[in-house]
Amino acid sequence: PGISSAASDVYKRQEQMKIQNLSEEFLAEIVTPISLYLDQTFPKRNQPYFICFTGGQGSGKTTLSFFIQKVLNETVKRPAMGFSIDDIYKSQEERRSLAKEIHPLCYVRGVPGTHDIKMGLNLINELSNASPETKTKIPAFCKPEDRHYPSEEWPIYKGKPDFIFFDAWCGGAKPLPEENWLPPLNQLEKEEDPEGIWSKWSNQELSKDYQTMFSLFDLLLMIKVPNMDFVYESRWIQEQTLAKTVKDKDLKNKIMTKEEVYRFVMHYERLTNYILKELPKLSDIVLARDGNFKFSISKTP
């Protein structure tokens, strides 16, 4: 009864969160079993467990992470918290200098090389060494303004969690083999990176601190979407949802058009294609998501 009441409470909140295409079936067949699995598989210990949710843009990683945290915190009474790779971007200044030094596309946030992985590692370290009274600031990034919120506005987590959830579109990914490097594969690469300088730089960055962070995962859960077209469409739905939730007029003006969203997703296409092919083998749990936004569990440990 506890789990189902938590699930129905979560279901009532979906309207308030403006999350589309969420069903009670998703909560009963996906959220609840995974929450119970985590509780039963990972007994209490001194160090938090580090769980990664990976999958393309708009696949539902953050939503799934949020609801599992809610069930663990409120029903199973296992403290859980989460953060996103989208909250640990490098600053505009850092990306600007990369753009001057390496390639103009390095300024655009999102691909490996544009995140401050050390910030993420420091956060994990702080939470792992926290006492019950420790207050840890969780980084928060404002996408429409392309900057971190001032640190005094960052959310605070009190105590030491049993679980740290991390959602990242490229979580767990290995670098692409460079010997079979494909020529430019979309309009963005053809026009702005015909020599592959930027895409190879990002791939090399993925082989550095990212692998250090990914090696800490106690469990990797992947949401596998059907294809790249789905990623484009999902990311556009996400932007429309953002447009409904943003009240500030200046921020509303920074919401992307459909063309801008598609151009933006082109930055991720090379690595996303590789992830869709290779990452299911490396993941502990794989959720398949079809074109109608329905989830099913396709791989379990």
Question: Language-model segments: which ranges?
Answer:
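N-terminal pre-Walker A segment at the start of P-loop NTPase domains
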Residues: K18-D39
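Conserved NTP phosphate-binding and transfer environment spanning the P-loop NTPase/kinase superfamily
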Residues: C170-P301
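Hydrophobic positions on the alpha1 helix immediately C-terminal to the Walker A/P-loop
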Residues: L64, I68
